[in-house]
Amino acid sequence: MTFNEKCVEAQVGNMNVKISTGKMAKQASGAVVISSGDTMVLVTVVGTKEAKPGQDFFPLTVNYTEKTYAGGKIPGSFFKREGRPSEDETLICRLIDRPIRPLFPESYLCDTQVMATVISAEEDHDPAILSMIGASAALMISDIPFEGPIAGVKVGRVDGKLIANPSAEQLKLSDLEIVVAAGKDAIFMVEGEADFVSEEDLLEAVFFAKDAVQGILAAQEELARQVGVAKREVAPLVVDEALKAKVKALAFDRIAQAFKIKAKQERYAAVAQIKEEVVAALAEEFEGRDKEIKGFIGDIEYDRMRHDVLETGIRIDGRDTKTVRPIAIEAGLLPRAHGSTLFTRGETQVLAAATLGTSQDEQRMDSLYGEYRKKFMLHYNFPPFSVGETSFRLAPGRREIGHGMLAERAISAILPNHDDFPYTIRIVAETLESNGSSSMATVCGGCLSLMDAGVPVKAPVAGIAMGLIKEGEKVAILTDILGDEDHLGDMDFKVAGSADGVTALQMDIKIGGVSKEIMQQALKQAKEGRLHILGKMAQCLAAPREEMSAFAPRITTIWIKPDRIRDVIGTGGKTIRSITEATGVMIDIDSDNSGKINIASSDKAACDAAIQMIRGLTDEVEEGKLYMGTVKKIMEFGAFVEVLPGTDGLVHISELDETRVKNVTDILNEGDKVLVKCIGVDKQGKIKLSRKAALGQSLEEKD
C-alpha cells in the first residue's frame, strides 16, 4: 500500500521543521505530522459539518497529550497509562488555543477539535512550538474556514544575541524566554518570562520572532496548495434587522445610563433588568427568541463601551485611559501563615499567603525528559463567590493553571539563590473579588507575602493588565482593565516586573493582530502603571522583614566530606533516623554527593544538637587541634581517650604531664574529662594524643 504523502519544510531558527500529510490519520478533517530533530507531533483537526441547532458560540476544543512512549518511558501511575493532563500539558493547550481562536469566521459555529499528540520527543526540539505550528498547518489543509496561517516560535537571548528556538543548554544561559505566535503581518500572542529585561529589548525580541516564522508560514501555504482541499462555504450570520431595530429602540438609551453606574454588581443588575424587561416587551411579537434579543442587547453593550472610550476617553468606571484603580494593601494579617498580604485594586482583591518549607516539600515533576523538582510553586484559586456566582468546583481549571503560572514566572525572577536561601517556597493566591486583572493582583500580593515572610527577594515586582479598543484608525490603550473591558475589548496584555525591567508578560489578541506601534505604547503605559503600583506597595513594605515568622522552619547548612555521608545515613538509614527522632529536626542530604546537609527546625537548640551529632559522626581528628575527651580505658603505658564519638586515641604515659608520671591513675581515671591535643596520626590511622601539650590552654583560646 502506498500513501499519497505531501511534505514541506522550512528553517525556524535552530529548528529545521518538516510538515507532512497523507500518511497518518487520514479520516480527520486535517492531519499533519510535524517534526524537527527526533521530535514528532501528530496534529489533527476535525470540524463537524453542521452547527448544533441554536448554537450561539464557537465550540473549539484543543487537546495536547505527551505520550510517555515518545520519551521511551512507561507511565509511573498504578494503571500504567496516561491519565489526566499534567500542568505542562494544560499550559501548552492554552498556547495552541489562544492564537488560533480569533482566526475563525464569526459565523462558523461548528464543533471543532484540535488534538496534538507527541509521539517522539527530543529536549532540544520543543514539541509545544511544533504543536502550535502543526495546529495551524492542519487547519490550513482542511476544509475548515481559517484565516491563517500562524506559527509559534520560542525566543531566547544569550550574551545580547537573540536566538529563535534555542537549545536546552542555550535556554539555561538566556535572560529571556518568550513564546510568540505571529502571522505574516501581525502578532497574535506573546507569553514568557525574563530577568528584568527592558521594554525596548522585549519589543525587539517579539518582532525578531515575527521575522523568524515567515518561512514556515510560506511552507504552510504551499502545503495547503499541494493538498488542494477547498474551504467549506460558511453562510454569514442572518440578522433580523426588524428585531434588532426594536431592541435598539427599547434598550440603547437605557444601556447608556446603566453604563454610568461605576459599581460592577449594580451595573450588572441594571443590565440584567433591562434584558428581562426588553424580552418581556417583545415576548408577544417575537415569542421564543429570548436568546436572540439578549444577544442584540449584548451588541449594544459592546458598541456603547467602545464608543464612549474612543470618543470621550472616559471608561465605564469614570477613569481616563491611563489611571490605575485605587489600591489598598495590608500585610501580615494571617497570624500563623509565614507571610500574608491582602491586596485590593478597585473591585479586584487577592489574599496571598507564603509558606516556607524544606527540600522534602519540593514538588516532584515528571516529564518526557526525566524527573525534576520544583522549589517554588504558586497556586492561583478563583472561587465562584469572587464574581458573585455559584458553581461545582473540583480540580483547578485551565484558566487557573494558566494564571498561576504567569504569576509564578513573574515572581521567580526575584527569588534569592537557593544556595543562599535553601527553602522550598509556596504561594497560594485566593481571589476573593474579581473585576479584571486578578492574575496581576496575584503578582503584587504574592511578592508582598514573600517580603512579609522575610524572604530576601532581589526586588519587589508588580503586575498590570493593559487593554485595547480599536475601530479603524481609532485606538485607545487602557491601563488596568476591568472585566468588561477585557470581555468587550480587543486585547488582554499583562505585564509584570520591577522598577528595572520586565519579568513576565502575556498578550492575547481578539482581532487580526496588533502592530509594533500599539505594542510599544502598551508597554510604555504598562511601565508607568507598574511604577505607580510599586510605589503603593513600598508604602506597605519597603523591604523584606528582617525576621522570619516564628512558625517558619530555620534551615542551617553544613558541609561534610562526601565520603562521610554514609556515616550520617547509617545502615538502612538507622543513624539519620536516630538523629531526627532524638532532636525533632528535618535533615536533608543533597543527592549530588557534594557533602551539603540542610538541617531544618523552628527550635534553634534542637538544630544545634543535631549539628553536634552530625559533626561527631563526620569530623576527623586533626593534628595540632585541641579536644575535650573522655577517658575510656586505662593501660599501664597510657590512657585511651575518646575525642569524637567512636573515635579515640592514646595518651602515652610520657605525654600525661610535664613531670615524670609513675602510674597513669595518678593523673587520669576512666570516665574523666580531659583536654588533649592531637600530636600525630600514623599511617594506620592510630591517633596520638598529649595531655602535656594541652596544659595551660583552653578550647576557647584555641578557637
UniProtKB/Swiss-Prot annotation:
Alphabetical keyword list: Cytoplasm, Magnesium, Metal-binding, Nucleotidyltransferase, RNA-binding, Transferase
Enzyme class label: transferase
Entries under Pfam families matching the protein: KH_1, PNPase, RNase_PH, RNase_PH_C, S1
Positions bound to Mg(2+): D486, D492
Cofactor(s) for this UniProt protein: Mg(2+)
Catalytic activity of the protein: RNA(n+1) + phosphate = RNA(n) + a ribonucleoside 5'-diphosphate
Gene3D superfamilies assigned: GHMP Kinase, N-terminal domain, K Homology domain, type 1, Nucleic acid-binding proteins
A GO term for molecular function: polyribonucleotide nucleotidyltransferase activity
The S1 motif domain, residue ranges: 624-692
Ranges in a coiled coil: none
GO cellular component: cytosol
Main location (coarse class): cytoplasm
Subcellular location: Cytoplasm
Its EC number(s): 2.7.7.8
Domain KH: start-end pairs: 553-614
GO biological process: mRNA catabolic process; RNA processing
PANTHER family to which the protein is assigned, alphabetical: POLYRIBONUCLEOTIDE NUCLEOTIDYLTRANSFERASE, POLYRIBONUCLEOTIDE NUCLEOTIDYLTRANSFERASE 1, MITOCHONDRIAL
Function recorded in the entry: Involved in mRNA degradation. Catalyzes the phosphorolysis of single-stranded polyribonucleotides processively in the 3'- to 5'-direction.
Family to which this protein belongs: Belongs to the polyribonucleotide nucleotidyltransferase family.
HAMAP family: PNPase
Protein name: Polyribonucleotide nucleotidyltransferase
Taxonomic source organism: Trichlorobacter lovleyi (strain ATCC BAA-1151 / DSM 17278 / SZ)
Gene for this chain: pnp
